Amino acid sequence: LIQKQSEYQKEAEKRANILREQNFGNRIYVRGLIEFTNYCKNDCYYCGIRKSNQNAERYRLSTEQILECTDTGYELGFRTFVLQGGEDAWYTDERILELVCAIRERHPDCAITLSLGERNRDSYEGRGRPLPASP
């Protein structure tokens, strides 16, 4: 069985590589990760920035600090930025929208991904206001 499993595994790997090559080619995508806040309203036990972790040194980057990060990343060749943080109530939908617009204004050819925990549908739709277009 082990020998057969190995044969099946090799065949599965071969087919998976063919599909990967057809769909994605031989490229690597690099994203600039900006961890702009480690405040979080949640208390997920596994998470280092959970609310009850009194050893975490809390921070929030200013808009200017975040924009400096994107400027530096852009100079280094990054064209996708991930804004990542805890579920920080200080960063309202309005603040996030302003931040995304500021980044888009400085770097219109860049993609922006948000990793901010759970948000409601209105948050992602900009409360009826269109978000800046992605390239």
Tell me what each language-model feature is.
Residues 41-43, 70-74:
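Short hydrophobic/aromatic-rich motifs at helix boundaries and adjacent loops
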Residues 1-43:
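Flexible, acidic/Gly-rich N-terminal and inter-domain linker regions that tether
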Residues 14-25, 47-56, 118-122:
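Short charge-dense sequence patches
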Residues 51-66, 73-100, 104-135:
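Core AdoMet radical
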Residues 2-3, 37-39, 68, 99, ...:
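Short low-complexity stretches enriched in small and charged residues
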Residues 29-65:
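Canonical Radical SAM [4Fe-4S] cluster-binding loop centered on the CxxxCxxC motif
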Residues 7, 18-25, 49, 75, ...:
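Generic secondary-structure signature for well-ordered alpha-helical cores
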